[in-house]
Regions:
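Extracellular glycoside hydrolase catalytic/binding regions
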Residues: 1-131, 148-153, 157, 162-164
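Short, solvent-exposed turn/loop segments enriched in Gly/Ser/Thr/Pro and often Arg
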Residues: 26, 134-142
Length: 168
């Protein structure tokens, strides 16, 4: 946490009052927020982040496949997104913190579509502590990547229909 706290202190010393988004360790997974595979769990380590302006948000990533790494087109279940986010959301509430889902995605199939919708609904229901989310990925370089939402030949990708009701 030394480097993160030094960066935050330097930003605040420069009189910047903006929100700072702080990622966790080990790909900053919501599913692994309490894991100690890489040493101290994010759930413990992130409590040592010091911001004189008290204006930090904790970022997690969460994919819906078996590895939680966005490595395949299969999703574990229709409720896996909310199940994997729940411990992180509880940590935010218990500690008076705010969070941000910096990466999430699911492929275009029935289970993943249900899981993405469930996760979006859960994030909206948790808006007291979750301040936003980003879908992975978009942009012309992704071509036919399973998670891209970049339109193909002017036609929206199927996942956009899932995301659209949650955009405001």
């Amino acid at each position: 946490m030394g480097a993160a706290n030094a960066a935050i202190a330097a930003i605040r010393t420069a009189k910047a009052a903006n929100t700072i988004i702080v990622p966790g360790n080990a790909w900053t997974g919501a599913h692994s927020w309490y894991a100690t595979d890489y040493g101290t769990a994010n759930a413990v380590a992130m409590l040592n982040i010091t911001d004189p302006a008290n204006n930090t948000i904790f970022e997690v990533h969460q994919y819906l496949d078996a590895s939680s790494g966005g490595e395949g087109a299969g999703c574990v279940s229709a409720k896996i997104g909310s199940a994997r986010l729940a411990p992180f959301v509880k940590w935010l509430r218990d500690n008076g913190k705010k969070g941000f889902v910096g990466e999430f995605a699911g492929a275009d199939n029935a289970t993943c579509n249900a899981a993405v919708t469930d996760m979006l609904q859960y994030m909206m229901a948790s808006s007291d502590v979750l301040v936003g989310w980003l879908w992975w990925a978009a942009g012309p370089m992704w071509n036919d990547y399973i998670f891209t939402i970049e339109p193909k030949n002017g036609v929206a990708r199927p996942q956009m229909a899932l995301l659209k009701p949650f955009l405001f």
